[in-house]
């Protein structure tokens, strides 16, 4: 009997120890499967009371598990670190306002679980990874790549047509409920829509005469509407009073962004060079439906040419851009047989902050006209990828190094002409450029194939 009692006692003790062991396992701290490797993000999260082990894995305590929204506004956290927020098991909403993001925001940097996003106070014009879209039977059809139930946008986003418009219309077509709002001109949020204002009444009247089908009144267009049959392929061109009787009265070309930035319109060009007024525009993102973009005396906040794969004519002046990357355009990168009425032209002058110009390195190297004038911050330019031209103007008073074309032929009237024909190309330079050794070597080598001239508004050095 005593032995039996001892057995019962030992069994009870073992059972209690077993329960204690189970309780101990349940109380062991739990950590995220993946670590936060970005030190900046970890510092921010620690300051908010979240805890991490020595390997960067987050403690999944009540605070972490109950976090469904996270305020990272004003932290300027790198977007590359945002993927690591997947350590939060129940996080759905992010406030990223006032973080200095832009001009492009990469939606793919977000964890897929994020369905609410506040981007107010950022300078975002473009999105990567939000939608893919194409035109089918005059309708824009979109595939949404990242679903949102809440999306708050900065005012700069009103110039985005390629991503936000199809995201909005596709959600509307599928009857999805999305709290989609955008900051208006007064600085407050309002429900997103596809109506956009052309504020200058004379410019609006000019555009309405060309594209009446997308105007909802005298000064507003609907960026989701397709162009009428007769409007497709219509160019925006303002250079002379003969083109528009009220051209002198236009004080602003704001709103032209909605045309330049609409990749769903058929091929056309935008050319505004009536130089009596200084204009300004916001973000420009021409895609492969724009063959020419000419904006003379026009300040430009942002210009993205990364997808301007059909652009062969670019003319700019009086803006504050610091770099121009032409490597994805057709400028000096177009086969002669494919030259169109707009030619192959690059003109840039009176842009005080321009420091760098990039040309396609392995292109066909043919330009009809290339003009670089009054670019005081441009110290070096490499034109070695150019092999044929009709006119070349280099008026760079602060230039320290000009790498000249490997000049092989003269471009003339749609043909490439051998030097033996006696035809010559125009070569105009400023005195400072003439004094560069590379210029003197270029002249010495090709003098008989070149003739002296100056572009309108600039006085050149008579090197010949």
Question: What are the roles of these predicted feature ranges?
Answer:
Residues 1-9:
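Bacterial N-terminal signal peptides that target proteins for export
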Residues 17-21:
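C-terminal motif of bacterial Sec signal peptides marking the signal peptidase cleavage site
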Residues 22-84, 93, 123, 134-135, ...:
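N-terminal capping/linker segments that flank leucine-rich repeat
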Residues 68-72, 94-96, 115-119, 149-151, ...:
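Conserved hydrophobic beta-strand positions in leucine-rich repeat
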Residues 70, 80-85, 104-110, 127-130, ...:
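Canonical leucine-rich repeat
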Residues 75, 99, 122, 154-157, ...:
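Conserved "Asn-ladder"/turn position within leucine-rich repeats
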Residues 87-90, 109-113, 133-137, 144-147, ...:
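Leucine-rich repeat
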Residues 100-102, 107-155, 348, 353-430:
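Ankyrin-repeat and related helical/solenoid repeat scaffolds used for protein-protein interactions
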């Amino acid at each position: 009997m005593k032995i039996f009692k001892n057995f019962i006692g030992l069994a009870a003790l073992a059972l209690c120890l077993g329960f204690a062991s189970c309780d101990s396992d349940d109380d062991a701290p739990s950590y995220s499967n993946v670590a936060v490797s970005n030190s900046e993000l970890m510092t921010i999260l620690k300051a908010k009371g979240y805890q991490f082990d020595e390997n960067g894995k987050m403690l999944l305590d009540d605070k972490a598990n109950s976090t469904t929204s996270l305020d990272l506004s004003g932290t300027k956290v790198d977007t590359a670190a945002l993927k690591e927020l997947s350590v939060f098991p129940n996080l759905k909403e992010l406030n990223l306002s006032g973080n200095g993001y832009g001009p492009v925001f990469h939606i793919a940097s977000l964890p897929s679980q994020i369905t609410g996003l506040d981007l107010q106070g950022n300078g975002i014009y473009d999105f990567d990874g939000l939608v893919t879209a194409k035109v089918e039977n005059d309708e824009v059809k979109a595939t949404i790549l990242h679903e949102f139930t809440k999306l708050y946008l900065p005012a700069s986003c009103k110039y985005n047509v390629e991503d936000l418009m199809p995201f909005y219309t596709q959600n509307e077509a599928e009857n999805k409920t999305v709290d989609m709002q955008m900051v208006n001109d007064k600085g407050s949020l309002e429900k997103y829509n596809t109506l956009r204002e052309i504020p200058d009444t004379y410019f609006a009247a000019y555009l309405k005469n060309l594209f009446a089908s997308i105007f909802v009144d005298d000064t507003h267009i609907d960026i989701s509407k397709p162009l009428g049959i007769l409007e497709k392929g219509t160019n925006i061109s303002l250079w002379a009073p003969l083109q528009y009787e009220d051209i002198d009265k236009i004080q602003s070309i704001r709103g032209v962004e909605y045309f330049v930035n609409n990749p769903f319109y058929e091929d056309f060009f935008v050319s505004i060079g009536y130089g009596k007024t200084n204009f300004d525009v916001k973000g420009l993102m021409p895609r492969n439906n724009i063959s020419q973009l000419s904006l003379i005396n026009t300040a430009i906040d942002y210009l993205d040419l990364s997808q301007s794969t059909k652009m062969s004519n670019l003319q700019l002046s009086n803006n504050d851009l610091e770099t121009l990357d032409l490597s994805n355009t057709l400028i000096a990168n177009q086969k002669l047989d494919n030259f169109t009425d707009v030619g192959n032209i690059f003109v840039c002058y009176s842009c005080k902050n321009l420091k760098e110009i990039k040309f396609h390195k392995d292109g066909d190297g043919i330009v009809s006209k290339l003009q670089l004038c009054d670019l005081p911050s441009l110290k070096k330019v490499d034109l070695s990828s150019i092999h044929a031209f009709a006119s070349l103007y280099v008026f760079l008073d602060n230039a320290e190094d000009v790498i000249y074309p490997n000049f092989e032929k003269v471009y003339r009237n749609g043909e490439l002409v051998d030097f033996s024909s006696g035809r010559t190309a125009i070569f105009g330079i400023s005195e400072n450029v003439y004094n560069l050794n590379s210029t003197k070597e270029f002249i010495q080598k090709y003098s008989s194939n070149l003739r002296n001239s100056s572009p309108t508004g600039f006085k050149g050095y008579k090197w010949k």
